[in-house]
Design a protein with these regions (language model features):
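Conserved beta-strand and immediately adjacent loop positions that scaffold enzyme active sites
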Residues: 34-36, 51, 73-75, 97, ...
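Conserved active-site neighborhood of the chymotrypsin/trypsin-like protease fold
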Residues: 56-129, 134-138, 153-156, 166
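N-terminal activation segment of mature serine protease catalytic domains
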Residues: 20-64, 73
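C-terminal segment of classical bacterial N-terminal signal peptides
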Residues: 14-20
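Sec-dependent N-terminal signal peptides
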Residues: 4-14
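Active-site region of chymotrypsin-like
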Residues: 30-39, 104-111, 136-189
Length: 189
C-alpha cells in the first residue's frame, strides 16, 4: 500500500513539474498585470469582487461592468497585495459587460498587458491568467473553438476550456503573450 501511495505521489509531483516547465516564458511577467477588483456600496459595505487587468502602464484597466453596478467606490489589489483606488470610469458597455477605468497607481508605472496585433484563428492555443498573490505560474490553457466577428472589426470568441468563476474578467492571451480578450461567462451559464 505504501509503495502504491509513494508511486502515485511521485507521479503527481512529476506532472506538476512538467506542467510548470511547459508554462510560456511570459506568464510570470504578465500575471503581475492581473488584479482583484473590490467594489463598495452604501456605508462602505463590500458590494462585489472580481478580476481585471491593466492595459497601460499608467493605470488604465479593463474588467466586467456588472461588478461596478451600484458601487460608490472601487479599489484594485495587485498581485503584491497593494491596494489602489479606481479614480475614473473611462467607458462602459453593459451589453458586452466591459468597463474601462483608470486606477490611481502608487508607483510610476504598473505592469500592463500588450494587445494582440492579430486576431487568433480557430484552433489557436490560448491561455487564461487568473489573479493570484502566489508566485506560481498557474494558467489555464485551451484553444479557440469559434471566432465570430461583429460590428465589422470586433471578435467574440468561444473557447474549448472550462471557465471557473474565479477566471471571469481575467485576460485571455495568445501564445505570444498578448491579450486579445476578457474572459466572460457564457450567455447560457
Amino acid at each position: 500500500m505504501k509503495k502504491k501511495f509513494f508511486l502515485l505521489s511521485a507521479l503527481c509531483l512529476l506532472e506538476v513539474q512538467w506542467s510548470m516547465a511547459q508554462a510560456p516564458k511570459w506568464v510570470d511577467k504578465a500575471k503581475r498585470a492581473v488584479f482583484s477588483v473590490i467594489t463598495y456600496g452604501e456605508n462602505d459595505k463590500i458590494l462585489n469582487t472580481g478580476n481585471g487587468f491593466f492595459v497601460t502602464e499608467d493605470g488604465v484597466a479593463l474588467s466586467d461592468c456588472s461588478l461596478f453596478e451600484g458601487a460608490q467606490r472601487a479599489v484594485v489589489v495587485n498581485s503584491e497585495g497593494v491596494q489602489m483606488p479606481v479614480v475614473s470610469i473611462m467607458g462602459a458597455n453593459d451589453m458586452y459587460d466591459v468597463i474601462k477605468f483608470r486606477v490611481g497607481i502608487s508607483t510610476k508605472k504598473v505592469p500592463a498587458l500588450n494587445p494582440a496585433t492579430a486576431a487568433p484563428t480557430v484552433g489557436a492555443n490560448v491561455y487564461i491568467l487568473p489573479y493570484s498573490t502566489q508566485k506560481d505560474r498557474s494558467y489555464t490553457a485551451g484553444q479557440v473553438k469559434v471566432a465570430d466577428e461583429f460590428s465589422g472589426k470586433y471578435h467574440y470568441y468561444t473557447l474549448n476550456l472550462r471557465l471557473k468563476d474565479k477566471m471571469v474578467s481575467c485576460p485571455v492571451m495568445t501564445e505570444e503573450g498578448q491579450v486579445f480578450a476578457l474572459a466572460q461567462k457564457s450567455s447560457g451559464a
